[in-house]
C-alpha cells in the first residue's frame, strides 16, 4: 500500500501548482468580498478553499486514471486493488488537510490587514477560522466519500455526470437554508451560540470528524468491492 500511496502522491504533485493557483484566486476574491461581514465573512475564503479541495483532488485523480491508459497500466503493477483504493482515499484526505491548513494559515496571516474593519486578531478569531475551515473540509470530504464509489464503478466521465448533481444539490440546499456566503461558519456559530466556547466548537468539529471517518470506512469498503469486480 505504501508504493500505491507514493504513486498517488506523485500524480498529485504534478497537479499541485494548478490546484494551488485556483485555490489562491478563490481565497483572495472571497476574503476581500466578505471581509466586511465580520468574523464569519473573514473566514469565507479559507472555508471555500477547504471545501473545494477534496472535490478537486478526487476529480483530478479520477481524470488522470483515464489518461494514456494509466488505470489499465496500474492494474499490471504489483498493487492489489485494495491497495489502490486505500491509497486513493488516503491521498485525498492528506492533500485536503494540507490545502485546508494552507488556507487557514493564509487567513490568519491576513488578519492584521483587516484590523481597520473591526476584525480583531485575537486567539478566539483564529480558533473560529481554523474550526470553520476544518468543518468545511470534513463536510466536503463526506460528499467525496459518497461519490467516490461511483468513480471506481463507472469510471471518471460517467461518475462525474452522476455525482455533479449530488454536489450541486447539496451546495444549493446548504446555501439556501443558511442564506450566507459562508454557511459552514454561520452554522457552527448558530449551534455554539452568540459567544461560542472553544470547547463547544472543538466538540462539534470532533463530532463531524467522527462521522467523516465512519463514512470513509464504509465508502472505502464499498469502493473496494466494486473495483475488484470491475473489468478494466
Regions found by a protein language model. Give the residues of each.
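Hydrophobic alpha-helical transmembrane segments of membrane proteins
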Residues: 1-69, 87-232
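Short helix-to-coil transition segments within interhelical loops
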Residues: 75-81
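Alpha-helix N-cap/helix-start motif at helix boundaries, enriched for small hydrophobics
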Residues: 83-85
Amino acid at each position: 500500500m505504501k508504493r500505491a500511496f507514493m504513486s498517488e502522491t506523485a500524480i498529485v504533485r504534478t497537479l499541485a501548482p494548478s490546484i494551488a493557483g485556483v485555490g489562491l484566486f478563490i481565497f483572495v476574491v472571497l476574503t476581500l468580498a466578505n471581509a466586511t461581514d465580520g468574523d464569519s465573512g473573514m473566514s469565507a475564503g479559507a472555508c471555500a478553499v477547504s471545501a473545494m479541495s477534496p472535490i478537486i483532488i478526487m476529480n483530478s485523480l479520477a481524470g488522470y486514471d483515464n489518461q494514456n491508459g494509466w488505470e489499465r497500466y496500474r492494474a499490471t503493477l504489483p498493487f492489489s486493488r485494495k491497495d489502490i483504493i486505500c491509497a486513493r482515499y488516503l491521498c485525498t484526505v492528506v492533500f485536503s488537510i494540507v490545502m485546508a491548513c494552507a488556507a487557514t494559515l493564509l487567513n490568519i496571516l491576513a488578519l492584521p490587514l483587516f484590523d481597520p474593519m473591526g476584525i480583531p486578531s485575537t486567539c478566539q478569531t483564529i480558533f473560529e477560522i481554523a474550526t470553520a475551515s476544518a468543518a468545511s473540509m470534513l463536510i466536503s470530504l463526506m460528499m467525496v466519500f459518497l461519490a467516490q464509489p461511483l468513480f471506481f464503478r463507472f469510471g471518471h466521465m460517467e461518475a462525474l455526470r452522476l455525482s455533479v448533481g449530488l454536489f450541486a444539490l447539496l451546495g444549493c440546499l446548504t446555501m439556501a437554508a443558511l442564506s450566507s456566503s459562508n454557511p459552514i461558519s454561520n452554522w457552527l456559530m448558530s449551534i455554539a451560540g452568540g459567544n461560542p466556547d472553544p470547547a463547544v466548537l472543538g466538540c462539534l468539529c470532533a463530532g463531524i470528524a467522527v462521522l467523516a471517518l465512519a463514512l470513509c470506512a464504509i465508502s472505502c469498503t464499498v469502493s473496494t468491492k466494486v473495483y475488484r469486480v470491475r473489468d478494466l
